[in-house]
């Protein structure tokens, strides 16, 4: 696959909306990320290119639409060899990586607030609907739309075979419009396709990976999401994603690379011969640590967000306290502190235009159009998993993952979704030191870290507790006669799947869900492995379980107090800025100093530490826009003492100055215009000249202190203005002062009339 750049230059304002509404002022918002940078979603680009290909085919040029863009509708219709040849990423602003890094460095400063960044690249457009009968605006038709500014250039990464280059280039040549209101002057674009420089980042992954240890039989890896990831669920398909990455997706990635680079299907069959292979699910993590599902025996206290109760020890609930099983979340325990980490999920809205392309939006189901939403795991999060197997299998998996860091996972990965980076963390052997991989004692706790498919003696899928217990005892090689007591805490789910090779769905079966726990007490001490897999389809990650000893022994002392439940600062990881192969991560979680639960989910207060603005940087653009806004506010504050006589006497002078400002670039030019206009012998003109000179002198005096005040208020240590910027800012302040004076004069006249 060759890499290219798709460049989109905006010839007019553009609004590409994701269907979300983020405040009460804007009815239709454009797509932008958490940092405030606008972008163009890849699915919109791919859809427009596909429409261009349809037009070209109608004009007589043959383009293999299904081969390049894939089949319309569900991507799981066909086999793996029918995937789209074209892969498009989101289109970001030119210089995005540098701007993103600058924003991350100054994260928390008022100048780099996401709203400031968004306002720097976008504008608001307000429209209404006019009644053809009355000629006036229809009631409740006023609406506001945010648009990306004309002149911006966006760049998208494209991967495709070189054989498809000419066809896609032809589509770009006729790609002229996109987005909302394209028949009303919005969305004019110029699209070009160019070759991309090969960075070599993927080939460098082998050198960056840790060495493969001798006799290694497991491999730990980290998945870093650069784009949202869709892991379709049984409940809602792509409309409701799972919040973890199934082991089957990692297994499929490895098999695909084996098939492409190591000898085809015969190499795949050889790799799968030994059933020792296990690809665990990848779960959310932070600071290099993997979090797992909260055990079913952990209960929360109603109206208490700081404490939890372990039902294994606290059977009697004090009067007035209500317990409920803790809701789904991922946890990691440190002593008695339970740290939780939630997976950030987002909804994105999409639509398919009708078969009649003259209609620009989804109208009804009968015309082939469709409006739908897709749920996905947000980009910027990290997931951790492990691959088990024989030495040969682990070596093969290591080679496949180390040779190429970038990978595309999940549903919809041909556009906008699924781009990830996989990094090998470590390898090891369970045979080197058995003490760390085993648990000894008479009391054991077996906890499912992944859903488990258990079959009973009749070869039927079962969710009977006794069948689960028998499966655990059999796997641990413990006789049922050794069992004294047991207690089972269960969660249930249903599982399915899709076989891409066959193009068929797997059967939906009931299963024990992750978080299920079995506590057993034996009449003898045993030594068992601390990790194991139960049930069926273990190769895909199902049935992963951990075995531990009890946290405390109530028989040898008082029951432990309720543990303290505290939340880690997971927002730092969830909002890491990751784009185009570069990552700017925040500090990992500090378990020694966790945030109190009251701070969970809250934004940090804006800092005003001094920063220095470099010429040509994002900070200079933001400071320029923010300073212009600040000048208007400053002028409105200073208007109260702008009059030395009655305000109404200034009215003609203020109006004339406002009208005459157009076309001037320096305030000295305005002064000459004032003298030439009012420099006559007439007493009225002398009075107007005096008023005009008062206003100009006031504007110059107040503006002289404005830069120092602005920098002090907003924590800016150095900001060098170009000479042309000084004149522009000074004229802007004069204009804002005149507008404020005009409003003040008008309000004064109205007040006098009312009196």
Question: What are the roles of these predicted feature ranges?
Answer:
Residues 1-116, 145-351, 355, 359-363, ...:
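RNA-binding basic/glycine-rich loop and surface signature characteristic of RAMP-family CRISPR effectors
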Residues 23-33, 472-502:
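Solvent-exposed edge beta-strands and adjacent loop segments
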Residues 84, 89, 133-137, 484-489:
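Short N-terminal helix-initiation segments at or just after the protein's N-terminus
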Residues 105-137:
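Amphipathic alpha-helical interface segments
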Residues 122, 140-143, 345:
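Intrinsically disordered, low-complexity regions enriched in serine, threonine, proline
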Residues 130-152:
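Helix-driven interaction modules
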Residues 136-141, 496-508:
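A short, acidic, amphipathic alpha-helical segment used as a generic capping/interface helix at domain edges
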Residues 449-480:
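Redox- and metal-dependent alpha/beta enzyme cores, enriched for Fe-S-associated oxidoreductases
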